[in-house]
C-alpha cells in the first residue's frame, strides 16, 4: 500500500503537531515496513527535524515541483497536491494536522484526518474572530471530506460530534503515542540530582507545554489546593503573561 501524508508539521514544527506527525510515520514504517510512505511538504523546513524521520527505503519526502506550485506552496498543499497524489496512484492520504487537500474524494483517494482539538470553538474568547473563522472552515471541511476521522481524545471526539454534527461512527479515538525515551529507566542518583537542583521535595505533577491560558494550567493549580496531600506542580514550557496568574 502506498500511503501519503501531509508532512508540513514534520519539517516545520519542533513540538506538538510535529512530534505527533513524526511519531506516527516512524511507528508505521517500523511496524509495517512492507508499505510505502510518501511525505508531502510545501518546503524542506528544518534539516534537524527532517532527520528525526528514521531513514528507510520505504519512506521519502516530496516537495512542489512545478513553478506555480513552488511560488504558491500553500495553494499546492490545499489543492494542487491532489493532482500529484492521483498521478502517484496513492492508496490512502492521511492529514496529520487537522487538514486534507480538496477534491480527494472526487479523485478516488480515500482520506483520514487527525483532529487534535477544537479549542478555538470551546474557548472562543482566546482567539481572534478571523482565526476562529479560518480554523472552523478548514477543520470542518476536513471532517466532512475525509472517510475516517482520528480524534486524539474522547473530548475531541465529543467536540467534533457536537460542533460539526459528525456522527460518532465516523470518528475513532486513537490516543497519541509516547516517545521511546520515556520507557528508559533512570538511575536513582540522577533523580536525586534533579530533585536537588530544582528544590523538589515530596510528590509532584510534571506539566510539559507552553504556559498560556488555553492550556488551563491554572485549573490544575486550583484543583491541587483542594487536596489534603501536599503535591507540587513542576511546569516546563515557554513563559507568557499568563504565568503571573
Predicted features, each with a name:
Residues 1-245:
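Carbohydrate transferase catalytic cores enriched for Leloir-type hexosyltransferases
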Amino acid at each position: 500500500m502506498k500511503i501519503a501524508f501531509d508532512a508540513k508539521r514534520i519539517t516545520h514544527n519542533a513540538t506538538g503537531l510535529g512530534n505527533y506527525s513524526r511519531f506516527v510515520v516512524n511507528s508505521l514504517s517500523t511496524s509495517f515496513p512492507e508499505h510505502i510512505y510518501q511525505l508531502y511538504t510545501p518546503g524542506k523546513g528544518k534539516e534537524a527535524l527532517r532527520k528525526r524521520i528514521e531513514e528507510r527505503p520505504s519512506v521519502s519526502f516530496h516537495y512542489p515541483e512545478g513553478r506555480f506550485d513552488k511560488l504558491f506552496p500553500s495553494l499546492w498543499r490545499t489543492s494542487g497536491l491532489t493532482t500529484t497524489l492521483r498521478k502517484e496512484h496513492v492508496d490512502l492520504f492521511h492529514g496529520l494536522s487537522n487538514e486534507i487537500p480538496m477534491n480527494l474524494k472526487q479523485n478516488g483517494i480515500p482520506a483520514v484526518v487527525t483532529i487534535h482539538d477544537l479549542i478555538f470553538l470551546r474557548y472562543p474568547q482566546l482567539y481572534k474572530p478571523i482565526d476562529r473563522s479560518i480554523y472552523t472552515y478548514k477543520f470542518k471541511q476536513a471532517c466532512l471530506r475525509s472517510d475516517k476521522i482520528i480524534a486524539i481524545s474522547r473530548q475531541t471526539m465529543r467536540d467534533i460530534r457536537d460542533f460539526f454534527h459528525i456522527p460518532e461512527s465516523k470518528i475513532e479515538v486513537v490516543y497519541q503515542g509516547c516517545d521511546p525515551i520515556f520507557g528508559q529507566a533512570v538511575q536513582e542518583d540522577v533523580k536525586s540530582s534533579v530533585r536537588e537542583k530544582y528544590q523538589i521535595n515530596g510528590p509532584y505533577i510534571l506539566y510539559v507545554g507552553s504556559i498560556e491560558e488555553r492550556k488551563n494550567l491554572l485549573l490544575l493549580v486550583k484543583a491541587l489546593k483542594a487536596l489534603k496531600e501536599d503535591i507540587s506542580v513542576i511546569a516546563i514550557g515557554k513563559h507568557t503573561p499568563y504565568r503571573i496568574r
